[in-house]
Amino acid sequence: MNNTNTNTNNKNLASSSASVIFSKYINNNNNKLIPFKIKNSDLGRTRYFPPISKEWKNSIYVFNHNNLKNLPLFDININSLIKDYFNLQFKDKILFKKKRLSKVKVVSLNKIYASKAEIKHTNTKAILTVYTFNREKISLYKKIKKLKKSFYFVFDKIISFSERVILSGVPIRVDKDGKVLSNLYLPFRLRGVLPWITESHVNIWRKIIIASLYKELILLRKYKLRLDLNKYKFEEKLLYRLNNLIMKYYNKKVEFNIVNMRSFLLNSDILTKILALKLKNRNARVIKIMDVILNKANLPKINRVQEKASLIKSVDWNLLENKFKNLNLSFILNDASYAERNNLSELLNKLYYNVLLVSQKGVWALRSPKGEQPSFHSKSGGSPTKFIQKGAGAASLGGNAKAQPKVSSFAKAKKYAKIYQIIFNSINYKNMGGLRLEIKGRLTKRYRADRSLFKVKWKGGLKNLDSSYKGLSSVNMRGYAKPNVEYSIFTSKRRIGAFAVKGWVSGK
């Protein structure tokens, strides 16, 4: 009995001493007991991961590493093939009476510029993405417009001359070359001369028109031939030949994605090529050319103070992860209303693709809840239903806006608008943020290396707004390259020596 009492007393002393030590520890550390509560998640949006093609020009995975050794050489050969393909022209005998100098062909800026190919490999095919700027097409259309004005000018002269001849009553004599031998002049124009026109007059006028517009017609034929060749370069009629040549390198099928750009400023490869070609001219002024290119860059007009302001950290309740504690579908259905439970597609559509139709300054646009970017808009005004109905007609009837769309096509247009906007808003760095140009090398008329130039000019900025100002994390490519900046370098030479052009294009 004595032993059992002593054991119980020892246990009581140990427990009391432990409780005293625990209470002293709590009082000394000033810790408070926190009851168990369910804490809501405060996750932020996931970081934007740029496409892998912007990091590596070749995206490939192979089991045998020896297959990768030839890829750098293949890239050089394929890029030169693509460049030569887009520089294809007719023989000089077809378009010109005498042979053109090769220097004129190289220095000419009116051609199709192509960037370096971005190649994605699969087991069965290689997908080549090439960005192009079709300067030749723009210049040819401008020349045709000038010809159109000259046509009208010559026709006015012929009509006024024919009116004078008909009024005089003297027969018109035309030689073999179509030149009119009778030279009459009257100081006024006669209107309503159609009753006097005969078949002989029509034949004579045809000869006069052909003789007077001979040069213009020959030029028009040349421009038409060049336009047709320019068009066929982007079609399967000629692309299959380039396809067959590239297939010999990779021993698999080749697929092309050709992106025709509206401005050469949107791609750094094309930008540096054009700048280097302009600097090949000995009389070119370096600073002036750089200013001309930078002035063509249209940066969005945004309040710089608001754009660079740091974000206030707060919980984004629009995210699905923060709306629900559990992302299981059964848990979401229990919290939903009875009507939404029966229609699962409407519930998911409401949760993920909540697109609002907003009217802003007479322009109906489909926008996200934050109003980040419009998917498409109509400046003609009208109600939003008419706007979507027009899109439904275009989507269902191949762009025939006159046909009346059915109810199903109206619903398809709404879904199409949502999908379009979701994809469009998920892409970052769509707007141009800035440009930077560097030129270095022998760009003076002196045969001295110490007279080489180094010029730098920029417009806008190259910094990533998320990581530099807003305090958000961003993904770096290859450890040092910024995801919002595209960089390229192009080397060229003059009679005196070589020079290089560097270009940076940033997005935001």
Curated annotation (Swiss-Prot):
The residues forming a coiled coil are none
Q: Which domain of life is it from?
A: Eukaryota
Q: Which UniProt keywords apply?
A: Mitochondrion, Ribonucleoprotein, Ribosomal protein
Location relative to the cell: Mitochondrion
Give the main location: mitochondrion
- Described function: Component of the mitochondrial ribosome (mitoribosome), a dedicated translation machinery responsible for the synthesis of mitochondrial genome-encoded proteins, including at least some of the essential transmembrane subunits of the mitochondrial respiratory chain. The mitoribosomes are attached to the mitochondrial inner membrane and translation products are cotranslationally integrated into the membrane. uS3m is essential for mitochondrial protein synthesis and required for the maturation of small ribosomal subunits.
Q: How does it assemble?
A: Component of the mitochondrial small ribosomal subunit (mt-SSU). Mature N.crassa 74S mitochondrial ribosomes consist of a small (37S) and a large (54S) subunit. The 37S small subunit contains a 16S ribosomal RNA (16S mt-rRNA) and 32 different proteins. The 54S large subunit contains a 23S rRNA (23S mt-rRNA) and 42 different proteins. uS3m, uS4m and uS5m form the narrow entry site of the mRNA channel.
Q: What is this protein's record name? A: Small ribosomal subunit protein uS3m
What organism does the record attribute this protein to?
A: Neurospora crassa (strain ATCC 24698 / 74-OR23-1A / CBS 708.71 / DSM 1257 / FGSC 987)
Recite the lineage of the species.
Answer: Eukaryota, Fungi, Dikarya, Ascomycota, Pezizomycotina
- Which gene holds the coding sequence for this protein? var1
